[in-house]
């Protein structure tokens, strides 16, 4: 007979710490770090810093997503899931899937494409301006006169957009799971 187990205080604490640490890191990276950095350093420096930090960030989110799903699934047998528990385990799974796609496919392609763009931009003395609006006209002219750069830019924007959506999806799933957990807490 399938039975729902009591995870005990240690497992519950680990689960809450992993989920909240992941969500906090996602909030910081998504809403603070990138915006502060892009306004403070040259564009190519920003890309280089992102290329070094994001693989760690993406894989930490992936590991935290796996741990959260594994702990939750271990103590909530499929046969005994309530509708709200079904939603919660689905959110954990969606987060894991989005984190895996982000870490293993979309983010690496975005980074490789960005570095190819940097090579062309350096040839045209671009990339040292601070902020997204620096030399906007020069980037536009480069796109118009260089079809290879234009294609790279389109590829970069497509993969960067999908990568950002995966990140936001994980952020929303983890946030919703934290809300579910908070609503189930008997007291503070």
UniProtKB/Swiss-Prot annotation:
Belongs to the TMEM205 family. It is a multi-pass membrane protein. It comes from Xenopus tropicalis (Western clawed frog). The keyword Transit peptide does not apply. InterPro entries: TMEM205 (IPR042623), TMEM205-like (IPR025423). Keywords: Membrane, Transmembrane, Transmembrane helix. It is found in: Membrane. The chain crosses the membrane at residues 18-38, 53-73, 89-109, 168-188. Its main location: membrane. One of its GO terms (cellular component) is membrane. It comes from the Eukaryota. The keyword Transmembrane helix applies. This is Transmembrane protein 205. Coiled coil: none annotated.
């Amino acid at each position: 007979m399938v039975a729902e187990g009591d995870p005990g205080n240690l497992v519950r604490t680990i689960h809450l710490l992993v989920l909240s640490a992941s969500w906090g890191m996602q909030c910081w990276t998504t809403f603070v770090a990138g915006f502060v950095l892009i306004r403070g350093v040259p564009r190519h420096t920003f890309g280089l810093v992102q290329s070094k930090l994001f693989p760690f960030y993406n894989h930490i989110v992936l590991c935290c997503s796996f741990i959260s799903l594994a702990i939750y699934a271990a103590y909530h047998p499929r046969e005994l899931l309530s509708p709200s528990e079904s939603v919660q385990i689905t959110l954990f799974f969606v987060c894991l899937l989005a984190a895996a796609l982000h870490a293993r496919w979309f983010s690496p392609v975005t980074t490789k494409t960005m570095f190819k763009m940097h090579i062309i931009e350096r040839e045209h003395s671009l990339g040292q301006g601070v902020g997204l609006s620096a030399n906007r006209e020069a980037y536009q002219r480069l796109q118009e006169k260089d079809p290879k750069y234009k294609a790279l830019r389109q590829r970069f924007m497509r993969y960067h957009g999908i990568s950002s959506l995966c990140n936001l999806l994980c952020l929303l799933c983890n946030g919703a799971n934290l809300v579910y957990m908070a609503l189930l807490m008997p007291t503070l």
